[in-house]
Amino acid sequence: MQERHLFTSESVSEGHPDKIADQISDAILDALLAQDPDSRVACETSVTTGLVLVFGEISTKAYVDIQKVVRQTIKEIGYTDGQYGFDGDNCAVLVAIDEQSPDIAQGVDDSLETREGDADPLDQIGAGDQGLMFGYAVNETPELMPLPIELSHALMRRIAMLRKQAVLDYLRPDAKAEVTVEYDDNDQPLRVDTVVLSTQHDPDVTLDRIRQDVIEQVIKPTIPADLLDDQTKYFINPTGRFVIGGPQGDAGLTGRKIIVDTYGGAARHGGGAFSGKDATKVDRSASYAARYIAKNIVAAELAQKCEVQIAYAIGVAEPVSVYVNTFGTGTVAEAKLATAVRDLFDLRPAGIIQMLDLKRPIYKQTAAYGHFGRTDIDLPWEHTDKVDALKAACK
């Protein structure tokens, strides 16, 4: 049992420079998968004032106008005005793409198991790299996500909506939110202690108006009233001015918001980013599978909280380890859960791709506001269709 404590998570808007990069990388990935579902993609993006650089390794039968995809993505985010120091019509776009290394491809196309004579087609694809991936679920929200990251994402979605609908017409695309939640001694959320929200804005709006609008039109409609009280602290644009933002204010790079993308720091992270990678990259696909497993375990009420680790060797199909941790909240032994997971979930890369239908162009929509706990889009790793099977396996 813990004492009362505070825990904080953050989110960033789709106009944050790192998130611009993530969305461009995933928009390119989706465009390639739409033409060639077997595309091998490792697409990185960097953005700065007036410049986008797209680079990486891609092997595909598809043809995609990368410049067009980049510019369209930037404009959809809201960078449509040269005053922002970055806009989709006028920025330079440089492309430096190579093919996937044949040394890597030989281990992905023909796994160690296949080379040793295994005829199972799901054993053919080896992991695209070594690595460890985590998935997590907790019963403190309906989405089975930690509350601080859920609230942070919700604030960012709300402020983007108000900007795009011109309700607050002085808003610009870059923004960040951070929410601190107080937990009781049973590790259940009690209240929101602090909300930090910084939003880019036009130069002529006053700080007082921004603060009033953010509290009344962003925070209060988003965070349930029973979580806010007279002691809740609000820090709105605490530097006093946020006119220069986006890539003009900070360079952005694919894969630099891995905690925003996942659980807001409430769970461990293996270090691998998601965006711009096709599903043979287990950094992405195995993280989705681990979330799928953890969410189904918690949804089955086999634990209140669950973290799953999966690890791989490059070029080998079967994971080298699968670990289930329920933090003392499980109703069955963790070893029994791990056995059930191995039996019910095919964690070979080809098995994950088949189980979650990952060759589709579904990735750009995940590149802002988190890859997990989403209710606004249908993501297969958020389904709880393994609950009955897990319950039966753990009797």
UniProtKB/Swiss-Prot annotation:
InterPro entries per record: ADOMET_SYNTHASE_CS, S-AdoMet_synt_C, S-AdoMet_synt_central, S-AdoMet_synt_N, S-AdoMet_synthetase, S-AdoMet_synthetase_sfam
Listed SUPFAM superfamilies: S-adenosylmethionine synthetase
Binding site residues for K(+): 44
Cofactor: Mg(2+); K(+)
Signal peptide span: none
Keywords carried by this UniProt record: ATP-binding, Cytoplasm, Magnesium, Metal-binding, Nucleotide-binding, One-carbon metabolism, Potassium, Transferase
EC number(s) stated in the UniProt entry for this protein: 2.5.1.6
CDD domains (alphabetical): S-AdoMet_synt
Binding site for ATP: 16, 174-176, 241-242, 250, 256-257, 273, 277
Keyword Nucleotide-binding listed: yes
Annotated L-methionine binding sites: 57, 100, 250, 281
NCBIfam families: metK
UniProt-listed PANTHER family: S-ADENOSYLMETHIONINE SYNTHETASE
Family as reported in the entry's similarity comment: Belongs to the AdoMet synthase family.
Function: Catalyzes the formation of S-adenosylmethionine (AdoMet) from methionine and ATP. The overall synthetic reaction is composed of two sequential steps, AdoMet formation and the subsequent tripolyphosphate hydrolysis which occurs prior to release of AdoMet from the enzyme.
Protein name per Swiss-Prot or TrEMBL: S-adenosylmethionine synthase
